[in-house]
Regions:
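Metal-dependent catalytic cores of enzymes that make or break cyclic nucleotides
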Residues: 1-191
Length: 191
């Protein structure tokens, strides 16, 4: 699976902005440790379409909008918001779906404070390949992981390997900034 420079740039922007539609969802829902109610799940499932809507007038991100909208479509058609099936889902959205799911499984979340190991998360991706995830994308992701674990480099010969650096999502950046910008209950509010 070879992607060009333009596709990689689109994927990078979509990766940063894919959860932008969560911006209006209350923290009590976003950070809820228990299972979401039906109403809360419906609200959460609207975030891809809301993200696309927020960016509708940003012409520079026209190519990324479908990736943001479709990053929760399941390969078998049971995802959201449009219930697309297989190849109907843009390839870059299928890649984003795998990356987003892997990150979610390997990070601490309110509903899962103990994250899965990368190996356990990859097993989940494999288990749901052909159901939730594009099997070819999962396979390519596995090859990338295996190559990195073995120390193989896909960089130019003679160049030092560039380490993979996790890039925070827009939501993570906004949350971090909000924590630092808002007064806490122990700090007096500025007049």
């Amino acid at each position: 699976m070879i992607l060009g420079e333009t596709e990689l740039e689109q994927l990078e922007w979509a990766g940063l902005l894919h959860d932008l539609g969560k911006i209006g969802i209350r923290d009590s829902v976003l950070l809820k440790p228990e299972k979401l109610t039906r109403e809360e799940r419906i609200l959460m499932n609207e975030h891809p379409a809301k993200g696309e809507e927020i960016l509708k007038d940003v012409d520079q991100l026209a190519a990324e909008r479908p990736l943001i909208r479709h990053h929760h479509e399941w390969y078998n058609g049971s995802g959201y918001p449009d219930r697309l099936i297989g190849e109907e889902i843009p390839l870059l959205a299928r890649i984003l779906h795998v990356a987003d799911a892997f990150e979610a499984m390997t990070a601490s979340r309110p509903y899962r404070p103990i994250p899965l190991t990368p190996a356990e998360a990859y097993e989940e991706l494999e288990r749901y390949a052909g159901i939730q995830f594009d099997p070819q994308v999962v396979e390519a992701f596995g090859r990338t992981r295996t190559a990195k674990q073995a120390g193989e480099s896909h960089d130019e010969p003679g160049e030092p390997e560039q380490p993979l650096t996790p890039v925070p999502t827009l939501g993570q950046v906004a949350a971090a900034r909000a924590k630092n910008a808002l007064p806490t209950s122990s700090a007096p509010a500025e007049p």
